[in-house]
UniProtKB/Swiss-Prot annotation:
Name assigned to this protein: Fasciclin-like arabinogalactan protein 3
Lineage: Eukaryota, Viridiplantae, Streptophyta, Embryophyta, Tracheophyta
Compositional bias (Low complexity): 219-234
Pro residues bias (residue ranges): 180-193
Similarity field: Belongs to the fasciclin-like AGP family.
Domain FAS1: 25-169
Keywords assigned by UniProt, alphabetized: Cell membrane, Glycoprotein, GPI-anchor, Lipoprotein, Membrane, Proteoglycan, Signal
Propeptide boundaries: 257-280
Function of the molecule: May be a cell surface adhesion protein.
Residue span of region Disordered: 180-262
Recorded GO CC terms: plasma membrane; side of membrane
Localization (cell): Cell membrane
Membrane disposition: Lipid-anchor; GPI-anchor
Lipid tethering residues (GPI-anchor amidated serine): 256
Length: 280
């Protein structure tokens, strides 16, 4: 019986040890996989913040890529350390949890606040949701909220999350603020390509009035048509009406000699009849 209990305790101890190793935070091991965060990894080691972060069980690091962190990397070491501590949130947040925040503005506690040096809430951050985007800024009243959430780089619920933001957050009293980078220039839209198969309309013929209104020398000169010569002109074709007139003329010709003889004989008969009547 005692052997079974001791075996169970041994297994439980090993399980707890393994789970603690698996869940242990190692910010250096995470960031070294991403070359774009190499400068931040170096600054965390230089300011001796790496072992402090690794001792935490639940943490969110607001990471800055090499270009973004360049605006503070040349400042005094103590100032850089205080600024970086304000980029370590003592809670777990990834994209899902950030977007699920119901409040428009949420106050987050940072590693700088845990040092007891915070004044006027400069050890807190504001997480603000606006127009579908998420912004971070100092918790000091009136401080700008200009560090935009970009993406979740690494997540190990609910121990470590690395969230990339667009620019450093410098709280009042921790150093001079960082200027907001200008937005990228807007590219002009490309010109629409001409539609295929669209026929170009032919120019409309000009009216005579257009030529009349045109200044001298611009109106087109048209050569007058030369009258055809008599030799070149073809003979007129016979008209059908002329044929009818010729036929009518043929019908109206004087009577022939036979018809004249008939008339003379009739006249003699008439005269004979008249003479006989007078004789009686």
């Amino acid at each position: 019986m005692g052997l079974k209990v001791s075996s169970s305790l041994l297994c439980l101890t090993i399980l707890l040890a393994v789970s603690s190793i698996v869940s242990a935070v190692n910010i250096t091991r995470v960031l070294e996989k991403y070359p774009e965060f190499s400068t931040m990894t170096e600054l965390l080691a230089k300011t001796e913040l790496t072992p402090i972060i690794n001792k935490r069980q639940t943490i969110t690091v607001l990471a800055l890529n090499n270009d973004a962190i360049g605006s503070i990397s040349g400042r005094p070491e103590e100032e850089v350390k205080n600024i970086l501590m304000n980029h370590v949130v003592l809670d777990y947040f990834d994209e899902l949890k950030l977007k699920a925040l119901k409040e428009k503005s949420t106050l987050l506690t940072t590693l700088y606040q845990s040092t007891g040096l915070g004044q006027q809430q400069n050890g807190f951050l504001n997480c603000t949701k606006s127009n579908g985007k998420i912004y971070f800024g100092s918790g000091v009243k009136g401080a700008p909220q200009t560090a935009e959430y970009i993406t979740t780089v690494f997540r190990n619920p609910y121990n470590l999350s690395v969230v990339q933001i667009s620019m450093p957050i410098v709280a009042p009293g921790l150093g001079s603020p960082v200027k907001v980078p200008p937005p990228p220039p807007m590219s002009s839209p490309p010109a629409p390509s001409p539609k295929k198969g669209a026929a170009t309309p032919a120019p409309a013929p000009a009216d005579e009035g257009d030529y009349a209104d045109a200044p001298p020398g611009l109106a087109p000169e048209t050569a007058p048509a030369s009258a055809p010569s008599e030799s070149d002109s073809p003979a007129p074709a016979p008209d059908k009406s002329g044929k009818k007139k010729m036929a009518a003329a043929d019908e109206a010709e004087p009577p022939s000699s036979a018809s004249n003889t008939g008339l003379s004989f009739g006249a003699v008969l008439v005269l004979g009849f008249v003479a006989s009547f007078v004789g009686f």
